[in-house]
């Protein structure tokens, strides 16, 4: 089981404020937040994750980190007595109201004796010098893999495998479509598939999506396997299978991002959209080594 690194004893001699990082979102966003926690914990040993909001979070599949990666939840939970103190003195409300949008801004905004971090931190720049530790922490819990997933993984390892992930679902809702749902169009995926096919003509595409029917209708694939067996609480196994591929085509989704990032092959080719959202400001979201496919 992964253990949170023990801080240098010299770090403990300096009085530091408690740093709390709010946990929220689906699995992909939870992983970005946990990655920030691990990186910060090295320099600031009094860093904890605030899981209190996850008790009432029913979207996606709730809090999944301890189950998917067998991470030690007790090592980063806030003690119950501390939560009561925080609620009593309104620390949480005050600090969320004053939070700002970047790591630099957070470090400048000290609210003794506590600093509250609220965001998604979707960039490897937050943990660029801590990648090995992140990969170790995000080792999938093999005991929970279904027989079908195990069999498919073995089959995948016999060929030049490329994952293609298509996210639709909530992205099609009016409040999300313009900013998120209009980015990874059929044209984007077709360009990415054509690019990969030119590089790897014998490749086999493994398709993961919450709308397989749409992919079959709109994206022409030369040699495709559509993965549909991971549903509900087993959805995370799609990320595991994506990470087992040699190369990846990602959607503008944190779930998709991690599936490609956890691919351990040094020579992997990852195709990503040239923009992540229509709103912009996401230039650093994808690693520089990933191949940007133009999005109109």
Could you tell me what each predicted segment is?
Residues 32-40:
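Short amphipathic alpha-helix
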Residues 59-195, 199-200:
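Secretory-pathway luminal glycosyltransferase catalytic domains
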Residues 278-296:
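Leloir-type glycosyltransferase catalytic cores
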Residues 22-32, 56:
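A short, glycine/small-residue-rich beta-strand->loop->alpha-helix junction that serves as a flexible
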Residues 46-57:
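A short beta-strand-loop structural module common to alpha/beta enzyme folds
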Residues 27, 190-280:
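Donor-binding and catalytic core of enzymes assembling or modifying cell-surface/extracellular glycoconjugates
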Residues 15-20:
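Extreme N-terminal starter segment of soluble prokaryotic enzymes
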Residues 5-6, 10-13:
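Short polybasic linear motifs
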């Amino acid at each position: 089981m992964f253990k949170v690194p023990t801080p240098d004893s010299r770090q403990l001699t300096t009085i530091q404020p408690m740093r709390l990082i709010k946990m929220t979102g689906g699995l992909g966003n939870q992983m970005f937040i946990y990655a920030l926690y691990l990186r910060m914990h090295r320099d600031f040993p009094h860093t904890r994750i605030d899981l209190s909001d996850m008790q009432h979070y029913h979207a996606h599949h709730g809090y999944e980190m301890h189950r998917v990666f067998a991470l030690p939840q007790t090592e980063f939970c806030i003690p119950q007595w501390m939560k009561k103190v925080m609620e009593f003195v309104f620390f949480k409300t005050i600090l969320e109201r004053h939070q700002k949008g970047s790591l630099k801004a957070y470090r400048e905004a000290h609210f003794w004796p506590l600093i509250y971090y609220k965001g998604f931190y979707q960039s490897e720049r937050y943990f660029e010098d801590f990648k090995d530790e992140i990969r170790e922490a995000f080792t999938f819990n093999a005991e929970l893999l279904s027989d079908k997933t195990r069999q498919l993984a073995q089959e995948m390892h016999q060929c030049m495998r490329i994952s293609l992930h298509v996210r639709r679902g909530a992205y099609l809702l009016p409040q999300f479509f313009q900013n998120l749902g209009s980015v990874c169009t059929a044209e984007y995926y077709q360009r990415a598939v054509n690019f990969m096919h030119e590089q790897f003509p014998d490749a086999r595409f493994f398709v993961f999506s919450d709308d397989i029917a749409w992919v079959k209708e709109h994206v022409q694939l030369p040699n495709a396997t559509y993965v549909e067996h991971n549903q509900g609480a087993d959805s995370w196994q799609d990320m595991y299978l994506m990470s087992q591929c040699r190369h990846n085509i990602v959607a503008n989704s944190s779930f998709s991002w991690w599936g490609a990032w956890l691919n351990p092959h040094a020579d992997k080719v990852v195709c990503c959209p040239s923009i992540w959202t229509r709103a912009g400001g996401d230039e650093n979201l994808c690693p520089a080594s990933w191949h940007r496919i133009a999005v109109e």
